[in-house]
């Protein structure tokens, strides 16, 4: 264990996906840190599956994790979409092309498998303390002091809250705002879900995904390596419940929700009830969502779910957490390089780093939240534009689907001070080609629109001329008939 009185550049509160990602980034770039985790281990068995997409995997590849992750996963390749009557709306294999076209697949992995993979890569194990929750945070002009529930006191230049939706660091930040807030002011629960895992089930193969568009209750699922099925049953609460009042559910309530969709068709040869019969995990929770109002103080900042909590329907929660870590580290590294070698960052520079990070991540976080809400509303067939838009996307060709997907990934950040792998460069090439193709399509669409407008104006002009001639003819019947102008007309 590191000496308790040692000063660090960064204290990380939280040892989940975001916290461990930060630790690995700091080790890669020689940034001193200390990580505090409230549970008794970093290798938690809580939660079910985690979706990893190209934007997150590109960063994990920079950290040397992707090969290990791919050994434990299988890419998603086939996607079935059904309506509430069991009619197949779409079956697409566009996702199966991600690996070859953009360098990384979309894959699902058990949380209890992903975290151990990541934790094995931590070298400075003496800088990690479990069973240590943040009890208090005190900021001064030149450092921040973090005290844990077991009495440990540490100082650092910055404390980063990677401590989830009920973040102690965010609570500290909220208390320092000009108008203090609580999480209830921006995080709520609008639906519940049973997250589950099932043993391999006949009728759904590894690499297949399903989604059902159904009012009030619906189900989505993914298959991972060895046929393990990860699934979510969603229920619309038809109201927004503040975080502090988020409902807690029993096993009986979880079972009741799952049985309500047991008859639902999820693949051509399978109904959800068969998957549920093989379940090994089935836990019902309220699904929190929201973006924090304040992301930082002078020496405290938040990343991951502490800053932006989205629903599982969007499939970007872990990936957005990884992105936020990369942006924070990029800002910190830029400040370090700009300062004189070996000099501690001044208070003003630290403030600038945190403010710049928060400013850059605020809009992507809001966009991620809006997209996850849109997908959730569409899955539950909530009337409105979201349902129409998502269902229209199901009609896209593979080419158009990939173009839109790659455009959505085109602005994703990565670690600027760590070399990209060959796959990372392929990612960049793919999004540049997507940008060029989108620009070409927009240019063509503009030219077509301009041509149509020109043609419309010409047609209107001709019609106006014809109407004018008809009017003249009615006023001068002799002239109209003979072409002779009457004297005095």
From Swiss-Prot:
Write down the membrane topology: Single-pass membrane protein
- The disulfide bonds in this chain are none
Family annotation (Gene3D superfamilies):
FAD/NAD(P)-binding domain
Query: One short Pfam family name for this protein?
Result: FAD_binding_3
Lineage, uppermost ranks: Eukaryota, Fungi, Dikarya, Ascomycota, Pezizomycotina
Subcellular location, record wording: Membrane
- The UniProt annotation places FAD binding at 37, 51, 111, 305, 318
Q: What happens when the gene is disrupted?
A: Impairs the production of bikaverin. Leads to the accumulation of the intermediate pre-bikaverin.
Q: Which family does it belong to?
A: Belongs to the paxM FAD-dependent monooxygenase family.
Parts forming coiled coils:
427-470
Summary of the function given for this chain in its UniProt record: FAD-dependent monooxygenase; part of the gene cluster that mediates the biosynthesis of bikaverin, a red pigment also considered as a mycotoxin. The first stage is catalyzed by the polyketide synthase bik1, which catalyzes the formation of the intermediate SMA76a also knowm as pre-bikaverin. FAD-dependent monooxygenase bik2 might then be responsible for the oxidation of pre-bikaverin to oxo-pre-bikaverin which is in turn methylated by the O-methyltransferase bik3 to me-oxo-pre-bikaverin.
Q: Which UniProt keywords apply?
A: Coiled coil, FAD, Flavoprotein, Membrane, Monooxygenase, Oxidoreductase, Transmembrane, Transmembrane helix
* Sample GO molecular function, one term: FAD binding
Q: Where are the transmembrane segments?
A: 7-26
Q: What superkingdom heads the lineage?
A: Eukaryota
Task: Name what induces it.
Answer: Expression is repressed by glutamine and at alkaline ambient pH and highly induced under nitrogen starvation and acidic pH conditions. Expression is also negatively regulated by vel1.
Region feature Disordered, mapped onto this chain? 448-474
Q: Which GO terms describe its cellular component?
A: membrane
Protein name as catalogued: FAD-dependent monooxygenase bik2
Name the Enzyme Commission number(s) assigned to this protein.
1.-.-.-
Per UniProt, the ranges with Basic and acidic residues bias are 448-469
Q: Where is the active site?
A: 213
**UniProt pathway:** Secondary metabolite biosynthesis
- Obligatory cofactor(s): FAD
């Amino acid at each position: 264990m590191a000496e308790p009185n040692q000063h660090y550049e960064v204290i990380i509160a939280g040892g989940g996906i975001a916290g461990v990602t930060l630790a690995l980034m700091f080790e890669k770039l020689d940034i001193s840190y200390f990580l505090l985790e409230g549970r008794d281990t970093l290798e938690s068995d809580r939660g079910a599956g985690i979706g990893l997409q190209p934007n997150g995997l590109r960063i994990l590849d920079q950290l040397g994790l992707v090969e290990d992750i791919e050994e434990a996963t299988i890419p998603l390749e086939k996607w079935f979409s059904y309506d509430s009557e069991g009619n197949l709306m779409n079956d697409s294999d566009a996702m199966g092309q991600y690996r070859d076209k953009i360098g990384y697949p979309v894959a699902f992995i058990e949380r209890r498998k992903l975290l151990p993979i990541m934790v094995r890569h931590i070298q400075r194990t003496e800088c990690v303390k479990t069973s240590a929750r943040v009890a208090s945070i005190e900021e001064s002009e030149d450092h921040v002091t973090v005290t844990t529930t077991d009495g440990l006191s540490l100082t650092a230049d910055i404390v980063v809250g990677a401590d989830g939706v009920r973040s102690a660091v965010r609570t500290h930040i909220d208390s320092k705002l000009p108008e203090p807030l609580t999480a209830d002011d921006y995080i709520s629960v609008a639906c519940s879900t049973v997250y589950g895992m099932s043993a391999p089930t006949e009728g759904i193969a590894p690499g297949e995904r399903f989604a059902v568009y159904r009012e009030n209750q619906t189900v989505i699922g993914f298959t991972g390596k060895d046929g393990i099925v990860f699934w979510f049953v969603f229920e619309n609460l038809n109201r927004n419940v503040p975080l502090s009042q988020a409902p807690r559910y029993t096993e009986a309530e979880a079972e009741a929700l799952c049985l309500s969709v047991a008859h639902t068709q999820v693949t051509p040869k399978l109904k959800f009830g068969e998957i549920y019969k093989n379940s090994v995990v089935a836990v019902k929770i309220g699904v929190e969502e929201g973006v924090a109002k304040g992301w930082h103080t002078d020496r405290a900042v938040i990343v991951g779910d502490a800053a932006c909590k989205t629903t599982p329907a969007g499939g970007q929660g872990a990936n957005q957490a990884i992105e936020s870590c990369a942006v924070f580290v990029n800002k910190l590294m830029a400040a370090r390089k700009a300062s004189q070698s070996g000099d501690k960052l001044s208070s003003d520079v630290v403030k600038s780093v945190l403010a710049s990070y928060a400013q850059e991540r605020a809009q992507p976080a809001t966009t991620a939240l809006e997209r996850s809400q849109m997908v959730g509303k569409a899955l539950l067939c909530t009337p409105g534009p979201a349902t129409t838009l998502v269902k229209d996307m199901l009609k896209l060709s593979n080419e158009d689907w990939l173009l839109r997907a790659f455009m959505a990934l085109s602005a994703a950040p990565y670690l600027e001070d760590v070399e990209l792998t060959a796959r990372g460069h392929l990612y960049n090439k793919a999004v540049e080609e997507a940008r060029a193709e989108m620009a070409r399509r927009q240019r063509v669409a503009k030219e077509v629109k301009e041509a149509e407008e020109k043609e419309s104006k010409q047609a209107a002009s001709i019609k106006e001329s014809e109407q004018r001639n008809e009017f003249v003819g009615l006023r001068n019947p002799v002239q109209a008939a003979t072409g002779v102008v009457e004297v005095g007309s």
